[in-house]
């Protein structure tokens, strides 16, 4: 499997413009990335431009804080899928997890899983930099219980990104049948190799072109 085919080619900055998205799409076609990951406002354009290319359209839900209501996340999910999204990366209710309210966290994830209705992969961002190891494990177990397809480390907008240690912990927790996505701070092929060796099955990065061409990007997040 090629490195490119494991990368979600990502542009999530708030000031991203149409020209940036079109460039992202062009690169995704050229390098055959797994998907482009864009904010919901760009899903329709990305879906139109990528139709028939084999490149998926990924978007983000409850992003980047995870603090919207479950009903809002469900609506966002349905809306994104109606516009052509085939993968959604949702942020958990981080405060509820830290409060020990597992029932609320699982219900929040399940709301998105049910809204996706198997029409899109659901990746669950747990924001590892804000969690203890016990909380990371608990978040992963709740994501699996709620029916998610992937667990994911980070938004790229908080205090830290992916680490190989967190990927290994997440992989150990979810087992072999659930995807694990590393995101945040991944800039080089060495970073990617480290994450894959630790158990990642997908990489989120804005530096995809640099990674696959062997360069080094100065961008530390999305």
Curated annotation (Swiss-Prot):
Pathway: Carbohydrate degradation; 2-deoxy-D-ribose 1-phosphate degradation; D-glyceraldehyde 3-phosphate and acetaldehyde from 2-deoxy-alpha-D-ribose 1-phosphate: step 2/2. GO terms for molecular function: deoxyribose-phosphate aldolase activity. It comes from the Bacteria. The keyword tRNA-binding does not apply. The keyword Metal-binding does not apply. Disulfide bonds: none annotated. The active site is at residues 89, 152, 181. Keywords: Cytoplasm, Lyase, Schiff base. It is an enzyme of class 4 (lyase). It catalyses: 2-deoxy-D-ribose 5-phosphate = D-glyceraldehyde 3-phosphate + acetaldehyde. GO terms for biological process: 2-deoxyribose 1-phosphate catabolic process; carbohydrate catabolic process; deoxyribonucleotide catabolic process. One of its GO terms (cellular component) is cytoplasm. Coiled coil: none annotated. It holds the Pfam family DeoC. Its EC number is 4.1.2.4. It is found in: Cytoplasm. Catalyzes a reversible aldol reaction between acetaldehyde and D-glyceraldehyde 3-phosphate to generate 2-deoxy-D-ribose 5-phosphate. HAMAP family: DeoC_type1. Belongs to the DeoC/FbaB aldolase family. DeoC type 1 subfamily. This is Deoxyribose-phosphate aldolase. The lineage of its organism: Bacteria, Bacillati, Bacillota, Bacilli, Bacillales.
């Amino acid at each position: 499997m090629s490195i490119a085919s494991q990368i979600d080619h990502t542009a999530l900055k708030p000031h991203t413009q149409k020209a940036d998205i079109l460039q992202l799409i062009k690169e995704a076609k050229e390098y055959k990335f797994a998907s482009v990951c864009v904010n919901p406002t760009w899903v329709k354009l990305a879906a139109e431009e990528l139709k028939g290319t084999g490149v998926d359209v990924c978007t983000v839900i409850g992003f980047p804080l995870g603090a919207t209501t479950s009903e809002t996340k469900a609506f966002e999910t349905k809306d994104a899928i109606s516009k052509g999204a085939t993968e959604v990366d949702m942020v958990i209710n981080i405060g509820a997890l830290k409060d020990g309210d597992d029932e609320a966290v699982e219900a929040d994830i399940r709301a998105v899983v049910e809204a996706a209705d198997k029409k899109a992969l659901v990746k669950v961002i747990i924001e590892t930099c804000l969690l203890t190891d016990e909380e990371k494990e608990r978040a992963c177990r709740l994501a699996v219980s709620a029916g998610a397809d992937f667990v994911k480390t980070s938004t790229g907008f908080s205090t830290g990104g992916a680490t190989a240690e967190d990927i290994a912990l997440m992989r150990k927790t979810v087992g072999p049948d659930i995807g694990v996505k590393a995101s945040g701070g991944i800039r080089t092929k060495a970073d990617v190799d480290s994450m894959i060796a630790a158990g990642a099955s997908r990489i989120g990065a804005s530096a995809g072109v640099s990674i696959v061409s062997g360069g080094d990007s100065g961008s530390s997040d999305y």
